[in-house]
Regions:
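Membrane-embedded, hydrophobic transmembrane alpha-helices
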Residues: 1-98
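Juxtamembrane segments of multi-pass membrane glycosylation machinery
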Residues: 2-3, 34-35, 61-64, 146-147, ...
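Transmembrane-helix signature of polytopic, membrane-embedded enzymes
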Residues: 34-43, 179-180, 196-218, 237
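Transmembrane-helix motifs of polytopic, lipid-linked glycan transferases
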Residues: 77-85, 180-203, 241
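Transmembrane signal-anchor helices characteristic of membrane glycosylation enzymes that use polyprenol
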Residues: 80-83, 107-131, 218
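Membrane-embedded glycan-lipid processing machinery
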Residues: 153, 157, 161, 168-173, ...
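Membrane-interface transmembrane helices that cradle and orient dolichyl/undecaprenyl
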Residues: 198, 242-260
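Membrane-interface alpha helices of multi-pass inner-membrane proteins
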Residues: 212-213, 259-273
Length: 273
């Protein structure tokens, strides 16, 4: 039980770190403008993008170390707290309406989805890895961490260039271990479901939003990949997040370069998955 609680806490802290980092980027990009929607999904994506870039810079310069990653995390959190105190980057707490708990039907649908995601969470934290993860998705970041940066890996054709998702796995491995890296891929799947729920709820209602999210999980490939440290759910998440932001930008009567900066950023992250 202690192991499960610790993994929940580890993932929650990592999610909070991504949110704080993403909120800082959002404030810098959209200063004086309304927040990008869906806000939570966008901030998670932006936070991940920043940490992908940070991991790449550290590894490329040979400065990759656990203590330095913790220092950077502390700096990000401190910068966010300063911005929040000044009223520039406060995080809004979701309401019952945001998660679609307005009636009995939606509450039952949300509870069912929660139970399924809980079961997938328990399977994800099981200390076992998939074939591809064992060959390169987790092994390559582990070798980078041991070497303090990028290094040639003989006979491994998948290590010729760092994938963005593997850089996220690298950050998670340095902050905790490979189980947290597996949970990142799980969390990317959850974020995709949140994005699907958000767009459908906005046009058809909360109950249909939960139904749409459930339909995504009916795909056996998606269901299987929740539990392993692969990269496919990351590709789907960043693609869909960029699409939602592009759609929102096109719906505005007045559009400017700021509206497309985040779209381009997330598309770039997706291209490097």
């Amino acid at each position: 039980m202690g192991f499960i609680l610790f993994e929940i806490l580890s993932l929650a802290l990592l999610v909070a770190l991504f949110s704080a980092t993403g909120r800082l980027v959002e404030w810098a990009v959209s200063r004086g403008h309304s927040a990008f929607q869906p806000a939570f999904v966008t901030r998670q994506a932006l936070g991940m993008a920043v940490w992908v870039a940070a991991a790449f810079c550290l590894a490329a310069s040979g400065l990759l170390a656990r203590w330095l990653v913790f220092v950077l995390a502390g700096v990000m959190v401190l910068a966010y707290l300063v911005a929040a105190v000044r009223g520039r980057a406060a995080l809004e707490m979701p309401s019952r309406r945001d998660v679609g708990l307005e009636g009995l039907g939606t509450a039952i649908a949300a509870s069912s989805m929660g139970l399924l995601l809980w079961a997938l969470f328990l399977q994800t934290i099981w200390p076992a890895v998939g074939w591809d993860a064992n060959v390169y998705h987790l092994t390559v970041p582990r070798l980078w961490a041991e070497a303090g940066g990028f290094r040639p890996i003989a006979f491994n054709v998948y290590s010729n260039w760092p994938l963005n998702t593997e850089l996220l796995f690298l950050v998670a491995s340095l902050l905790r271990d490979y189980v947290l890296a597996k949970l990142i891929h799980y969390w990317l799947g959850v974020l995709t479901l949140i994005a699907v729920f958000w767009i459908v709820r906005r046009s058809a209602g909360a109950l249909y939003g939960w139904f749409a999210a459930a339909l995504v999980l009916c795909n056996q490939i998606v269901l299987a990949e929740f539990r392993v440290a692969y990269v496919d759910l990351a590709f789907g998440f960043f693609f869909f997040a960029a699409f939602l932001l592009l759609q929102a930008a096109l719906e505005r009567e007045r559009r400017g370069p700021r509206d497309l900066i985040v779209v381009g950023l997330l598309s770039g992250v997706m291209a490097g998955i």
